[in-house]
Amino acid sequence: MELLFTLMTLIAFSVLGLLLAFLCFIMMIMFMGKSIGDPEYPPVKGTVFHQLFYFTKLHDYHTQMAKTHPTFRLIAPDQSEVYTIDSRNIEHMLRTNFDKYSKGKYNQNIVSDLFGLGIFNVDGDKWRQQRKLGSYEFSTRVLRDFSCSVFRKSAAKLVRLISEFSHEDLVFDMQDLLMRSSLDSIFKVGFGANLNCLEGSSKEGSEFMKAFDESNALIYWRYVDPFWKLKRFLNIGGEAALKRHVKLLDDFVHGVIKTRKAQLELQQDSNVKEDILSRFLMESKKDQTTMTDQYLRDIILNFMIAGKDSSANTLSWFFYMLCKNPLVEEKIAQEVKDFTSSHESEPNIDEFVANLTDATLDKMHYLHAALTETLRLYPAVPTDGRTAEADDVLPDGYKVRKGDGVYYLAYAMGRMSSIWGEDAVEFRPERWLNNGIFQPESPFKFIAFHAGPRMCLGKDFAYRQMKIIAMTLVRFFRFKLANGTQNVNYRVMFTLHMDKGLPLHAIPRS
């Protein structure tokens, strides 16, 4: 017995010794050749292990460091990660020296299982091809009219569903409803498919949404997990779950592509293809070598995260802000009544949404300001960046080396008094208005839609969707937090998702 105890103790200490040796090796790799303490390079404020420790509040961790060091570094085993809130650096990277910064192998390796060769994960010819096609599609009147029609129907469905909760005085998860509604809309606009996820009648749709959100979070975890490649090789932990989720996504999307191809074969006499996938499929006939089903799958999933998550997440934070700022909610409600001529106590929902024309949406300056203010504080993509393709010097004087990741902190920027004034952390739509007219800021200061040549193609598309949903829901309901004044936290993933949803009560305005 004593011998067994001695052997077990020896084994335990041996394992501990190997672990310590491995950690020492990792730390040596992390700090060698990284110019620690060199004033020409951004100051080192931590390592990837610090991000691991603060992961659940990662964006606030970055914000605290950026308050004292607008540009700083975190050290990882295979590269330095430079973080900045300096708009000069951001413009330098995203526009002035666009060709010197790419997505980079490091980022591409991390996200390729989910995003493949989609527009958010490629450079060069593939990026230009998708950008050109996407730019054309988003500029067509056909897509504009079709998408607005879909958004109006989605808004009406939301009102009817929330009315049921309201009449029974039930608490509901607003984020979940917005995610389901947005998924339905994006599938209809993007792929010509009726998913019926909001009504809950589509098990496949619900499973797809869950798999997509979980994949989003698990992929982002790779940025702070130095052992993710080992876990993927062994097919354990989160990597095993990610593999299952991605397979479900692949099977579902390839099924959508197959179905749409078959439908198009029966519609050959029609030249007007309203949904985006149909027009990409028509394009694929000209270039069957490049535009494979797998390539279309990648394009679809990139479109999904841009369309579903960005709008639904922003609207979730928007309604959270309205609950925290009821005077803002009432100002928006009054603006909606004034510009839709719907002062009657109980307007007809179908007639109301039918009147939400482009001309009406364009008049909603206060609503536009409130949505933009939401994006300032809760950007859909809280952190984004590029990889330096050559040694460079940033406008603030700091050097970066070839291979360094350079990230801009949109979430932190929205909270900086040096950028937005002493009231930076306050939700104040008025900061965007001049005599009641919306005034935009530089995209390198307000970075929610990216900037430069890769600026978001769907910006106007997103604002139209958000305005139609927001106008409709605010016209028919007042909203209150189900848990009183309790704060809502985010879940760390590519997009700024609420952790545990947004439980609300809805009170009919009539």
Enumerate the predicted regions with their spans.
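Conserved cytochrome P450 K-helix/beta-meander segment immediately N-terminal to the heme-binding cysteine loop
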Residues: 408-437
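Conserved cytochrome P450 catalytic core segment spanning the I/J/K helices
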Residues: 139-141, 244-315, 342-357, 364, ...
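Cytochrome P450 heme-thiolate "Cys pocket" and heme-binding signature region
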Residues: 136, 432-466, 491-492
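Conserved cytochrome P450 K-helix E-x-x-R motif and the immediately C-terminal K′/meander segment
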Residues: 48-70, 251, 255, 351-398
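N-terminal membrane-proximal hinge/A-helix region immediately C-terminal to the signal-anchor transmembrane segment
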Residues: 2-129, 150-161, 245-248, 390
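Central I-helix of cytochrome P450 enzymes
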Residues: 182, 186, 246-253, 283-340, ...
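Cytochrome P450
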Residues: 2-21, 75-82, 142-153, 163-188, ...
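Cytochrome P450 heme-binding "Cys pocket" and the immediately downstream C-terminal segment
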Residues: 326-328, 406, 459-497
